[in-house]
Amino acid sequence: MLRVIKEALTFDDVLLVPAHSTVLPNTADLSTQLTKTIRLNIPMLSAAMDTVTETKLAISLAQEGGIGFIHKNMSIERQAERVRKVKKFESGIVSDPVTVSPTLSLAELSELVKKNGFASFPVVDDEKNLVGIITGRDTRFVTDLNKTVADFMTPKARLVTVKRNASRDEIFGLMHTHRVEKVLVVSDDFKLKGMITLKDYQKSEQKPQACKDEFGRLRVGAAVGAGPGNEERIDALVKAGVDVLLIDSSHGHSEGVLQRVRETRAKYPDLPIVAGNVATAEGAIALADAGASAVKVGIGPGSICTTRIVTGVGVPQITAIADAAEALKDRGIPVIADGGIRFSGDISKAIAAGASCVMVGSMFAGTEEAPGEIELYQGRAFKSYRGMGSLGAMSKGSSDRYFQSDNAADKLVPEGIEGRIPYKGFLKEIIHQQMGGLRSCMGLTGCATIDELRTKAQFVRISGAGIQESHVHDVTITKEAPNYRMG
């Protein structure tokens, strides 16, 4: 006798039912909880994949209101450095600015500029006393690189400084009066406490929806594995200032993953931890009991994932989301829908099934900010995109996600493929279209907030003919829409 538990559904099996509405799409509130302590301004996360999320994409997504998760297919130092770059990209106050010594040569300063990507540094002596500041303008036309920072810096007597509690108007007034773009934050004894830049204020005004921490810095997440040896990686990421840690595995309902969550929670009781992936209520409860702040759902729905075909295991995504959300609804632990999102309507369906936000890979792969070079094939531009269970990704470090870290390279059993995806342009345009579709859904269903969509919206099950009718049919597309591409 077959032990069939129940029937399970995915995105193309259902549609949301329109309802009476007083909600206009442009008034819908897209903010949602990632964890109890982290609120997103849009319900979107980027996947921790080596062809999706590194520094550039994490910065761009945070500026739009979401969070990117830096992948782990790199050294500990490199991953921590990428987290630091996101945290330093935009700040209300840079609380720990990179400083230089007055005796540093301009040649060494030039290397520091190349490494960090910016050219302004407070200058401190051996006792950490603030003695000046040096900027790119100070050294722009200098040819003798053997000279030192002290020869060209703005000295202490001419520094523009404020105390930590200075108002925005006071800071802007000083910048205008002295025609400077950097103001240093100092203590009563003139110790350096931070730096404020005009560029950061301008970025804040241009991106008011940005997802930021309490210090005005962009938020960023990072992924780690569950296997032995990840303790050092976790410590380095926490030290780098990561906002949320992702303990990532293809099977989150396994003892090794649960133990990693328990150990991390014991060591860092206040650290937001996302754990996954699971596809059942039991798996979600186990991760929550272990100490997860949010649970990631999805086994095999991704476009580049072959887990369900290779192993025969998985649960269609709508049912998996609904089961996990129902199991955790009284605990206040959010569910993240990871995988299978092709259209903005799928985002709406995932949230209506109970997810607080979605994690996407293929939707963001191929953007300007995604890692990798643009490749031309038959006259069209592409970027590479591969699953973390592909042979290429596993050989670079993701094999532990699939419990194969002890396998030799020629003995790996892949659960994903390597491919290419059309070049899509800038991330902000993709997000605009996807969130526009979500807003329209909220207007059609009468849901003013993400929480209302999660709890009020109703589904109907549809047939194969229903999904065929839903797509474009009986016509040849002559001009592609930015939010609708088949294949």
UniProtKB/Swiss-Prot annotation:
Gene3D superfamilies with a match to the protein in the record: Aldolase class I
Coiled-coil positions: none
Signal peptide: none
Residue ranges of every copy of the CBS domain listed in the record: 93-149, 153-214
Residues the record marks as active site: C305, R401
Pathway field: Purine metabolism; XMP biosynthesis via de novo pathway; XMP from IMP: step 1/1
GO terms assigned for molecular function: IMP dehydrogenase activity; metal ion binding; nucleotide binding
Catalytic activity: IMP + NAD(+) + H2O = XMP + NADH + H(+)
Positions contributing to NAD(+) binding: D248, S249, S250, G298, I299, G300
Self-association state and partner proteins as the record states: Homotetramer.
PANTHER family linked to this entry: INOSINE-5'-MONOPHOSPHATE DEHYDROGENASE, INOSINE-5-MONOPHOSPHATE DEHYDROGENASE RELATED
Protein name: Inosine-5'-monophosphate dehydrogenase
Organism of this sequence: Pasteurella multocida (strain Pm70)
Taxonomic lineage of the native organism: Bacteria, Pseudomonadati, Pseudomonadota, Gammaproteobacteria, Pasteurellales
